[in-house]
């Protein structure tokens, strides 16, 4: 188990702070710690709610890289409002409106979907 913890700490950029108290970690590091705790269970599916909320630009970039790495061999569902971040990590984008799927597909297709434009841009 300890070897797995060391391995996961490396994946989520926490090797250097592995022995620190979680309260002393930055916001981004705390998010990575939570992702690491999920990875310890070796899930086939991960669901992350706004994983980059409150992160610095550098932490956001590292998180995008992390999600691209951990999505190899598993499905990762990310709920996120930051479309610039979504562009970096998503293969498929689903836009919901009032609990129903409004549009789904590649980012460019979704962004140009007239329904999405009408609902979110009011045009």
Can you describe what each PLM-predicted range is?
Residues 1-17, 65:
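Conserved ABC ATPase "signature" region
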Residues 21-25:
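Conserved ABC ATPase signature
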Residues 42:
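Conserved catalytic motifs of ABC-family nucleotide-binding domains
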Residues 46-50:
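Catalytic Walker B motif of ABC-type/P-loop ATPase nucleotide-binding domains
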Residues 60-72:
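Helical segment within the ABC ATPase nucleotide-binding domain
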Residues 86-88:
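A short, surface-exposed alpha-helical micro-motif characterized by mixed small hydrophobic
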């Amino acid at each position: 188990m300890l070897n797995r913890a060391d391995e996961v700490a490396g994946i989520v950029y926490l090797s250097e702070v592995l022995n620190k108290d979680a309260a002393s970690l930055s916001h981004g590091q705390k998010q990575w710690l939570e992702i690491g705790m999920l990875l310890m269970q070796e899930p086939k599916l991960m669901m992350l709610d706004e994983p980059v909320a409150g992160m610095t630009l550098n932490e956001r970039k590292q998180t995008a890289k992390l999600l691209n790495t951990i999505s190899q061999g598993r499905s990762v569902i990310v709920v996120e409002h930051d479309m610039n971040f979504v562009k970096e990590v998503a293969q498929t984008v689903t836009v919901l409106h009032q609990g129903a799927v409004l549009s789904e597909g590649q980012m460019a297709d979704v962004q140009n979907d007239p329904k999405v434009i009408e609902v979110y841009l009011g045009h």
